[in-house]
Design a protein with these regions (language model features):
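Alpha-helical transmembrane anchor segments
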Residues: 501-524
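Helix-rich C-lobe and terminal helical cap/extension of kinase-like folds
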Residues: 3, 25-33, 179, 222, ...
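Hydrophobic HxD+1 residue recognition
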Residues: 272-276
């Protein structure tokens, strides 16, 4: 507890030192531009806050441009730790001197991030005379786990205060969101897990002309060290460079939409850390450019029920079927029982209808999202912590989409992908596959169920379907329905946000803790 109080005090001191109260009252404080002071303060606070800054850097629509531009530097300019420490970690983890693993190892980091830093190297060839493989070596930052765990404790304290003191604290579920954030960010610290994530994405997209994932060298990968193929793509941040190469941004944007939907629905495994530093473009064929993915520490999955109900919401939204969206939310009980479907339908239509027919460049997503939050408050919608990761990633992807092709017809591009998925998922072929998969088990259970029913009747117990049992069954059905409907975060909070967000997403690829502070800021505003 003392450590948390000390950390909170440290944060307060940094706010004063860097004059950050200027962002609240508008009164100039400190030396130098306020955006530089904000970036330096976030760097001083460590990985959790750096990630927050990274998320904000993709939101020039809700931040002044100079602040968004400065926060983008957090992605490349985190001070590196000494290469001597990196060498020690590599040798300790892999059990060999570096010279026995690599023909060449660069002491100058290629990139330095809040969780790890990356060095370039060349693996020793397996056969004499052969060429070594160009690789990148990702090394976990020393002491980062201790630092993150301390900041998680601070976030827990803040979340508890918000849940207790804020009028809408319970609905926002801040403690549950922090718990999800903790799991996600701690998973990011395991390099072996990241390598496995990359391997699965590579398998899902092997041979695809849309996106490429690097080879992972598991013989040289451990909990704190990851060795993978070095890619030579152009960062998506270098728009002028891509433009000079003649890259067709419209094709790039359309391919991004396709990748997003296929990762979420076809593969049920998506890249969830989509800041610009993690997206490269292969411009070798500018007319049909493709993507290259890096950094796989954060990924997401959905349950089959999540996928189905998200798909229903997407398609209803694309078809402007606001009645169906409202019905789904009322049925799921994510909004209070007794809510009139007509009222919720009208609220969704009011916010959503104006965005159709507009290019993304003409849509203020920040204003749109604030309106969606207003609907959520009005209908006492329960925030779903398990989907904050997805929502947070959508915010990142939306920021990237604005950098590509603002005139993309998102609805025309995305709708066929979703309809094809629904057809494959719910068509006769899929039903037959499920029957073949589950039929033998069901057939095996039937005799036992019949035998138990007969024995109950012989004992004079009946089948026991009294009023109490019926009530229990109803509760169980409702509970199962709520579980199945988790994915319906709501058109007001997710569906509308998604379809705007994905215009130009590279691949769907988080750190979900950035979402709940945004909600708290919205509450205060």
């Amino acid at each position: 507890m003392f450590g948390r109080v000390r950390r909170l005090w440290h944060i307060q001191r940094l706010v004063s030192r860097y004059g950050l109260r200027e962002f609240v009252d508008g009164k100039p404080r400190g030396e130098g531009p306020r955006e530089v002071r904000l970036r330096e303060a976030l760097e001083s606070l460590g990985p959790v806050f750096i990630k927050f800054g990274q998320a904000l850097s993709t939101r020039p629509d809700i931040l002044p441009p100079e602040i968004a531009l400065e926060l983008a530097k957090l992605q490349d300019r985190v001070p590196p730790f000494p290469s001597s420490q990196a060498r020690e970690i590599i040798e300790s983890q892999l059990g060999k001197p570096i010279d026995e693993i690599f023909d060449d190892f660069s002491d100058e980091p290629l990139a330095s991030a809040s969780v790890a830093q990356v060095h370039t190297a060349k693996l020793k060839p397996e056969e004499p005379g052969a060429a070594g493989f160009d690789v990148v070596v990702k090394v976990l930052r020393p002491g980062v786990e201790v630092s993150i765990r301390e900041d998680i404790k601070v976030l827990r304290t803040i979340a508890s205060l918000v849940e207790t003191l804020h009028p809408e604290g319970r609905r926002l579920c801040p403690k549950a969101i922090v718990a999800e954030y903790e799991k996600t960010i701690l998973d990011e610290l395991d390099m072996m897990r990241e390598g496995a994530n990359c391997a699965l994405l590579r398998r899902n997209w092997l041979g695809s002309p849309l996106i490429y994932h690097p080879v992972v060298f598991f013989d040289y990968t451990s909990e704190k060290v990851l060795v993978m193929e070095r890619l030579d793509g152009i960062s998506i941040r270098e728009l002028d460079h891509l433009r000079d190469r003649g890259v067709d941004f419209s094709v790039l944007a359309e391919r991004g939409v396709e990748i997003f939907f296929k990762q979420v629905f076809r593969d049920n495994f998506f890249h969830a850390d989509m800041h610009p530093g993690n997206i490269l473009v292969n411009a070798s064929n500018p007319a049909v450019p493709s993507y290259q993915a890096v950094d796989f520490g954060i990924v997401g999955t959905l349950t089959p029920g999540d996928q189905r109900y998200l798909a229903e919401n997407f398609l209803a939204f694309f078809n402007r079927d606001y009645r169906r969206i409202a019905e789904l939310h009322v049925e799921s009980e994510w909004i209070p029982v007794g809510t009139r479907v007509e009222d919720f339908e009208s609220a969704i239509r009011t916010v959503s209808e104006p965005i159709f027919g507009k290019p993304i460049k003409d849509i203020s997503f920040g204003v749109f999202l604030l309106r969606l939050f207003h609907i959520a408050r009005r209908f006492k919608y329960q925030v779903q912590p398990q989907l904050v990761l997805l929502q947070k990633t959508l915010l990142q992807v939306e920021g990237l989409g604005r950098q590509l092709y603002p005139d993309l017809d998102l609805w025309k591009t995305a709708k066929p992908v979703m309809e094809e998925w629904m057809k494959d998922r719910l068509g006769p072929g899929q039903v037959m596959q499920r029957l073949r998969r589950e039929g033998p088990h069901m057939a095996e259970m039937l005799p036992e169920l019949a035998s138990q029913a007969i024995k109950s009747l012989e004992r004079g117990e009946g089948l026991g379907v009294g009023k109490k049992t019926i009530a229990q069954m109803r509760q169980e059905l409702q509970r199962n329905n709520r579980q199945q409907m988790r994915a319906t975060v709501g058109a007001a909070l997710l569906v509308g946000a998604t379809v705007i967000a994905v215009a130009g997403s590279a691949h769907f690829p988080a750190l979900l803790g950035m979402a709940w502070p945004a909600w708290l800021i919205d509450r205060k505003s």
